[in-house]
Curated annotation (Swiss-Prot):
Residues 80-175 form the Toprim domain. This is Recombination protein RecR. The gene is recR. Disruption phenotype: Mutant is sensitive to the alkylating agent methyl methanesulfonate and the DNA cross-linking agent mitomycin C. It comes from Streptococcus pneumoniae (strain ATCC BAA-255 / R6). SMART domains: TOPRIM.
Length: 198
């Protein structure tokens, strides 16, 4: 169906979001058009504000509005342990269980030979720099239980073990193919408590 240009452009914008197909994009566009002008303005203001005010922590790579982030600057955190994650959303999932008290490092992706993503394409160099200048004795690899997550964890293990750093992996309990972001708190707690050395 042909829609007026402003609606078609809005549908196109929504359809660029991950997981949003054309039907959902159309529903969102029409819902947005039906919102009050004040609500649309607030939505637009919040979207622009988030884009403008958020940055990545220069230490851990987590999405934050402070640099360095509040976790990296918290002196009560365990400075000897770093939990390595794929995405900033995974940090929030781990923080929700309130049992991990160490530091984080966000890779912003995983090694994926099939997709042409090499170790140089993810946030590994800053992790190595961090480890050289710190008292870290353990790195917990908390990548998703996928082929790319496994490839990344094995690469980190081979890279860090010769440096005398203990490398562990979250225990199974996370289903193969599952995303950490969507795991419940009990599953995450058991996974971190029962992590295994690589």
């Amino acid at each position: 169906m042909l829609y007026p240009t402003p609606i078609a452009k809005l549908i196109d914008s929504y359809s660029k979001l991950p997981g949003i197909g054309i039907k959902t994009a159309t529903r969102l566009a029409f819902y947005t058009i039906g919102m009050s002008a004040d609500d649309v303005n607030e939505f637009a203001k919040n979207l622009l504000s988030a884009k403008r005010e958020l940055t990545y922590c220069s230490i851990c790579g987590r999405l934050t509005d402070d640099d360095p982030c509040s976790i990296c600057t918290d002196p009560t955190r365990d400075q000897t342990t770093i939990l390595v994650l794929e995405d900033s959303r995974d940090v929030a999932a781990m923080e929700n269980i309130q049992e991990y008290h160490g530091l984080y490092h966000v890779l912003h992706g995983l090694i994926s030979p099939m997709n042409g993503i090499s170790p140089d394409d993810i946030n590994l160099k800053s992790l190595m720099t961090r480890l050289m200048d710190s008292e870290v004795s353990e790195v917990i690899v908390a990548t998703n239980a996928t082929a790319d997550g496994e490839a990344t964890s094995m690469y980190l293990s081979r890279l860090l073990k010769p440096a005398g750093i203990k490398v562990t992996r979250l225990a199974r309990g996370l289903a193969v193919g599952a995303d950490i972001e969507y795991a419940d708190e009990v599953t995450l707690l058991r996974a971190i408590e029962n992590r295994t050395e690589l």
